[in-house]
């Protein structure tokens, strides 16, 4: 009950931290989509690049999050941004690349060869086939990677509070520092709720964007 009262009494503060957390995650994952999907297309077209690119993305994901955030501090200190949102967004961007690149590569690489041949047969260019045939067919799997990146990094971004990024991780950090169980539970609950709601919204968006014939 104490936790519920705490959340009700601090609803405005919780809302501010939630929107801050959401903005940080969506910006990082959005950048990863802009880079990761074209990178996935590139390694399908140039297959020799697949192993090094996916290997490097996998290597980044194996670095413990607290260590990666720590590595960002001296790097961004060179431009006067050692703590705050910029190093946190960069770290989460790097974490987001693997599921997006891998799912894009897997989805496009597993399409039936006859699909591409049919496109060539009617005179489509590579970009036309990609835009009108291949991406729509691969969209459910690509979206699966995006959803994985978002849900995974909602939790990862909470750790970014230790480098001054803000967000819901502040509740966990301050709760631990002050031995306040209410803040710890409130932070954990809000992070879980945010992950569940975003995953549901992305699932609905995936359904809306996927062609009816392959739903």
What are these model-predicted stretches?
Residues 206-215:
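Short cytosolic juxtamembrane segments of multi-pass membrane proteins
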Residues 103-142:
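Short cytoplasmic-facing helical segments at TM-TM junctions of multi-pass membrane proteins
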Residues 12-23, 54-61, 73, 77, ...:
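Alpha-helical membrane-interface segments at transmembrane helix boundaries
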Residues 168-204:
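Hydrophobic alpha-helical transmembrane segments of polytopic membrane proteins
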Residues 39-72, 92, 97, 102-106:
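Cytoplasmic-entry segments and transmembrane alpha-helices of multi-pass inner-membrane transporters
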Residues 127-159, 186:
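Transmembrane alpha-helices
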Residues 14-42:
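Transmembrane alpha-helix signature in integral membrane proteins
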Residues 16-24, 71-99, 139, 183, ...:
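Loop-to-helix entry region at the N-terminal start of transmembrane alpha-helices
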């Amino acid at each position: 009950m104490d936790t519920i009262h705490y959340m009700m009494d601090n609803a405005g503060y919780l809302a501010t931290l939630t929107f801050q957390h959401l903005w940080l995650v969506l910006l990082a994952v959005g950048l990863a989509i802009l880079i990761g999907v074209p990178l996935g297309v590139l390694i399908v077209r140039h297959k020799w690049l697949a192993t090094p690119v996916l290997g490097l993305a996998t290597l980044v994901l194996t670095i413990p999050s607290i260590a990666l955030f720590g590595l960002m501090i001296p790097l961004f200190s060179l431009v006067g941004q050692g703590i705050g949102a910029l190093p946190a967004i960069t770290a989460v961007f790097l974490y987001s690349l693997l599921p997006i690149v891998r799912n894009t590569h897997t989805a496009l690489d597993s399409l039936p060869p006859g699909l591409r041949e049919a496109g060539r047969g009617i005179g489509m260019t590579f970009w036309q086939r990609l835009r009108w045939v291949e991406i729509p067919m691969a969209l459910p799997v690509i979206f699966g990677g995006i959803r994985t990146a978002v849900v995974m990094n909602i939790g990862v971004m909470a750790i970014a509070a230790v480098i001054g990024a803000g967000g819901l991780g502040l509740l966990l950090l301050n709760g631990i520092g002050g031995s306040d169980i209410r803040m710890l539970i409130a932070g954990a609950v809000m992070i879980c709720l945010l992950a569940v709601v975003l995953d549901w919204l992305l699932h609905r968006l995936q359904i809306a964007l996927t062609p009816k014939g392959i739903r």
